[in-house]
């Protein structure tokens, strides 16, 4: 509930800034000589909201920045932050599933099997456990609805749906019509409060593929040096 309130407050502030940026009743900070005239609001719950006004089009560019990135990865599971970024697009209890009550026991079983797999050292036993994980994952996938988050964003007119993981941040990006900010806020509140981890295997393959593609990027090599 607290996170829901955070996002609703964020939505209200953004809407207020678009409608009456010059008469905001909220206290804010600013940076001297900032050409964008950004306003920095700190809500009672500690959430920081950065806002600038662009009246060229009736749209709002949104960034939800989380203070976690590659530097927070455990030594034995590097890439975890990037992997989780991908899993944030897999839905919640409300969307991304045909029947969450039927899906949940299988997702719980997958999580338990992975924990056993992690603690098992015998290679033959690990292979047997992983085979079981594959089987349960396949059954769970029958209840999942692929790309439903993207479809929800498209339905409200959003473009540029994306995310990226850096050294100390993970950022989720949308470009939305200004009259859809309430719907955007409700979806994001549900997404961040009730995210369901599903589609483990397929998304892991996607992350591996992105990593393989980056191995030939000179810019990426410099960044990771």
At which residue positions do the language-model features occur?
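Bacterial N-terminal signal peptides that target proteins for export
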Residues: 1-9
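Short, glycine-/polar-rich solvent-exposed loops and beta-turns at beta-strand/coil boundaries
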Residues: 56, 77, 164-166, 200, ...
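Short acidic/His-enriched helical or mixed secondary-structure segments at domain edges of catalytic enzymes
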Residues: 206-225
């Amino acid at each position: 509930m607290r996170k829901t309130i955070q996002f609703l407050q964020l939505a209200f502030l953004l809407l207020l800034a678009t409608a009456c940026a010059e008469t905001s009743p909220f206290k804010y900070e600013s940076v001297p000589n900032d050409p964008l005239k950004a306003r920095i609001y700190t809500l009672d719950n500690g959430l920081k909201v950065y806002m600038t006004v662009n009246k060229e089009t009736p749209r709002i560019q949104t960034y939800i920045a989380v203070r976690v990135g590659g530097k927070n990865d455990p030594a034995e599971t590097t890439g975890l932050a990037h992997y989780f970024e991908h899993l944030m697009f897999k839905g919640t209890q409300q969307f991304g599933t045909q029947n969450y009550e039927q899906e949940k026991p299988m997702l719980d079983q997958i999580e338990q099997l992975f924990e056993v797999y992690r603690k098992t050292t015998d290679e033959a036993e690990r292979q047997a456990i992983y085979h079981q994980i594959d089987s349960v994952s396949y059954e769970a996938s029958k209840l999942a609805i692929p790309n439903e988050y993207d479809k929800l964003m498209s339905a409200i007119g959003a473009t540029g749906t994306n995310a990226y993981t850096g050294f100390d941040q993970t950022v989720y990006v949308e470009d939305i019509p200004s009259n859809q900010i309430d719907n955007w806020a409700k979806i994001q509140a549900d997404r961040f409060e009730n995210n369901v981890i599903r589609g483990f295997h397929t998304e892991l393959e996607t992350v591996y593929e992105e990593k393989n593609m980056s191995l030939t990027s000179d810019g990426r090599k410099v960044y990771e040096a």
